[in-house]
């Protein structure tokens, strides 16, 4: 077996998790900033804005979880070995 395959799999697993978490991280930061700005503009809508803000990161984190699943597949059930 070529020793480069396990090494490349570890690097690919790290890149999968790292790159998969960049987008949701930026998205959650933007969403939180816009929510604070919206609450500052309309304090009476705080409840609606907060409810939406607390439910939306669950869908954003799905991308990070997909990256983690790919990394775990490359680490433990490596299809290249």
From Swiss-Prot:
InterPro entries xref list: ATP_synth_csu_bac/chlpt, ATP_synth_F0_csu, ATP_synth_F0_csu_sf, ATPase_proteolipid_c-like_dom, F/V-ATP_Csub_sf
GO cellular component, one term: plasma membrane
Transmembrane segments: 3-23, 61-81
Gene Ontology MF terms: lipid binding; proton-transporting ATP synthase activity, rotational mechanism
Disulfide bonds: none
Site (Reversibly protonated during proton transport): 61
Pfam family, one: ATP-synt_C
Keyword hit for Plastid: yes
Keyword Repressor in annotation: no
Membrane topology note: Multi-pass membrane protein
SUPFAM superfamilies, alphabetized: F1F0 ATP synthase subunit C
Keyword terms: ATP synthesis, CF(0), Hydrogen ion transport, Ion transport, Lipid-binding, Membrane, Plastid, Transmembrane, Transmembrane helix, Transport
Subcellular location: Plastid membrane
Note: In plastids the F-type ATPase is also known as CF(1)CF(0).
Role of this protein: F(1)F(0) ATP synthase produces ATP from ADP in the presence of a proton or sodium gradient. F-type ATPases consist of two structural domains, F(1) containing the extramembraneous catalytic core and F(0) containing the membrane proton channel, linked together by a central stalk and a peripheral stalk. During catalysis, ATP synthesis in the catalytic domain of F(1) is coupled via a rotary mechanism of the central stalk subunits to proton translocation.
Family (UniProt): Belongs to the ATPase C chain family.
Subunit and interaction comment: F-type ATPases have 2 components, F(1) - the catalytic core - and F(0) - the membrane proton channel. F(1) has five subunits: alpha(3), beta(3), gamma(1), delta(1), epsilon(1). F(0) has four main subunits: a(1), b(1), b'(1) and c(10-14). The alpha and beta chains form an alternating ring which encloses part of the gamma chain. F(1) is attached to F(0) by a central stalk formed by the gamma and epsilon chains, while a peripheral stalk is formed by the delta, b and b' chains.
HAMAP family linked: ATP_synth_c_bact
Protein name: ATP synthase subunit C, plastid
Organism lineage string: Eukaryota, Viridiplantae, Streptophyta, Embryophyta, Marchantiophyta
Gene that encodes the chain: atpE
């Amino acid at each position: 077996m070529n020793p480069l395959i396990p090494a490349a799999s570890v690097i690919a697993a790290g890149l999968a998790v790292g790159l998969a978490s960049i987008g949701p991280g930026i998205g959650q930061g933007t969403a939180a900033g816009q929510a604070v700005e919206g609450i500052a503009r309309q304090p009476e809508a705080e409840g609606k804005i907060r409810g939406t803000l607390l439910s939306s990161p669950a869908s954003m984190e799905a991308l990070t979880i997909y990256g983690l699943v790919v990394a775990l597949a490359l680490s433990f059930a490596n299809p290249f070995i």
